[in-house]
Amino acid sequence: MQTLKPYILLFAFLSLSLFSLGQDRYKLRTGDPNGINKWYMGRQIAQVMSHYGIDWLEREEREMEENTSLLLKNLAVKPGMVIADIGAGSGYHSALLSKMVGTGKVFAVDVEPEMIAYLNERIKQEKLSRIVPVLSTEQNLSLPENSVDMMLLVDVYHEFSYPYEMALSMLAALKPGGKLVLVEFRSEDSAVPIKTIHKMSEAQAIKEFKAAGFRFDKNIDNLPWQHYLVFTK
């Protein structure tokens, strides 16, 4: 028993150190009532849009407001690609991407079981055979390492309860040289009619993704309301 004691103490020390790092990374304090009172790198994390927001995700005005067609053109999808739609929700983007990947596939990743159930029904009804629904956790995508050519996150990253851990998981799932496209409403533009907590600045996004090991490539600044930020592994 005496010989085990140093190892037990070492394990306890390492566990406490890791816990302390997690506590230091996130700050708990009040702020915008539409947030979760948890802050990361000076940014308050927003509340998650639940499955009750499906009608808003599928609204007819979305193409006009966000120019989804241009967003998809920016992606330059090639047949055979493996794309992950992170925070896929109702499958609005996944359904469109599934028609662009040819023999490839689209991982439609979401943390809500209700969204995954909705996606499964949509796949069945619309015969979207290239879509693979994936239920993630708050800290892990549940995707294989080095399996994805491109990731797309549209208006969802700012809601992640554990943005650092999720960014690490995204980095791991991307193939070497793979791209991550982050689309977020521009906080720099007061004319964008979205609540402040559901916006992000370019500088904030770059700071957070660089902290997880991503390289910033470019901002394709051609969407009406949103940043289109490209990061690489």
Model-derived segments and spans:
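A short acidic, Gly/Pro-enriched loop at the edge of an enzyme's catalytic core
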Residues: 141-150
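Conserved class I S-adenosyl-L-methionine
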Residues: 181-206
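Core SAM-dependent methyltransferase catalytic element
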Residues: 212, 218-233
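Class I SAM-dependent methyltransferase SAM/SAH-binding core
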Residues: 84, 88-140
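A short SAM/SAH-binding and catalytic strip from SAM-dependent methyltransferases
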Residues: 149-163
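Class I SAM-dependent transferase core
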Residues: 24-76, 81-82
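Helix-to-beta-strand junctions that scaffold the AdoMet/dcAdoMet cofactor pocket
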Residues: 101-102, 160-161, 174-176
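A short glycine-rich, Lys/Arg-flanked "PGG" loop and its adjoining helix->strand segment in the class I
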Residues: 164-179
